[in-house]
């Protein structure tokens, strides 16, 4: 878009060149002829026929009245099941026997068997939703929520057993749902809760046998997909609402600045900012000395920055001084070397330069000239111009070549590359549409020997494809024009 705007702004300038006018004329002719060829080839008419044919046979939407229509809308609930902390949980049933639970970055596996792992004497006995001794804070609320969702009541039902999270065996919680003696109603209630949130699971517990639920952290299996229906069942089983509180973290920041607010590593001001709002607090050298003891660390840090700043400044000054001394030494050596070379050439009668007289080639028509070159001396007298005739002839050739190259570059610069691209692609467009015009496309289909049944699309039996008209059993043919 920027290139096109620049091209439009430069139209009055580049139209001053005859070549640019020719390129514009060729581009316009090719575009116009290409559009004419594209229209005459029948491609547009064929596309319009294929799009509109048969539209009168059916409606796009089901209309109930004049201004009422039957429509639908779909919602994507995948955003509710994100992989962040304190989000809605996901449940999975793998192979009808393996139960899984996931919320945020924590995932768990639920096993139901008859093997006793935890005992009341060696492990932790819990009878409240506070499971801090069993799981981490991010996992504690998820497990407590799941236990309540399957029907456990902390104030009425038996307590649970869990392994201390500091043990190396791993985190684990055990629930006894054996339907025997006085535990039968409790076991049936938790079983119904499991059947509700894990639809289609197989029951591994049998009457009269011990049955235990074990919950332990485990990676979420790859074959488990996010299903919001399981989450809805889980939420419907919950007995209370959970409001998760969120706090802002790392919202404010501080930086060292000068009194004007510009960032400076050695500044004595602290700038507190939040997005665009800021607050500036400055500490001078004398103010630092009278600050309370709680702010001595801030003062020491500012003094350290000031010391480092002065050290860097001193190092830069010393470096500049040494570089200048080295440059003067090198220049002196070069000057001595040139003087010695000229003296040797004078002794050997070799032409040399004394840097007092120079020659150059001047182009009188354009006023341009070449770079000055030294006029050589031999035996204390300047050389005759005929003695270095080849040199100034070559210099004149170089000058003319440079002038021609510069003029060519200026002419090229006055022809925008966008105009060249337009001319090239318009020519390609014209050639392509010319072939399409020579080939030709059929524009519609109708019954042979009869009129055009537009906008209906016919089948091989001469009837409308949508079924509005009965098959006439007549041959059809494609025509190019109406």
Swiss-Prot record:
Zn(2+) 2 binds at residues 444, 446, 452, 482. It comes from the Viruses. Residues 2-17, 54-58, 59-421 are extracellular. Residues 33, 443-482 are cytoplasmic. Keywords: Disulfide bond, Fusion of virus membrane with host endosomal membrane, Fusion of virus membrane with host membrane, Glycoprotein, Host cell membrane, Host endoplasmic reticulum, Host Golgi apparatus, Host membrane, Host-virus interaction, Lipoprotein, Membrane, Metal-binding, Myristate, Transmembrane, Transmembrane helix, Viral attachment to host cell, Viral envelope protein, Viral penetration into host cytoplasm, Virion, Virus endocytosis by host, Virus entry into host cell, Zinc. It holds the Pfam family Arena_glycoprot. Disulfide bonds join 92-224, 134-162, 205-211, 269-282, 353-374. A lipid is attached at residue 2 (N-myristoyl glycine). GO terms for biological process: fusion of virus membrane with host endosome membrane; receptor-mediated endocytosis of virus by host cell; virion attachment to host cell. The chain crosses the membrane at residues 18-32, 34-53, 422-442. Signal peptide: none annotated. Stable signal peptide (SSP): cleaved and functions as a signal peptide. In addition, it is also retained as the third component of the GP complex. The SSP is required for efficient glycoprotein expression, post-translational maturation cleavage of GP1 and GP2, glycoprotein transport to the cell surface plasma membrane, formation of infectious virus particles, and acid pH-dependent glycoprotein-mediated cell fusion. This is Pre-glycoprotein polyprotein GP complex. The lineage of its organism: Viruses, Riboviria, Orthornavirae, Negarnaviricota, Polyploviricotina.
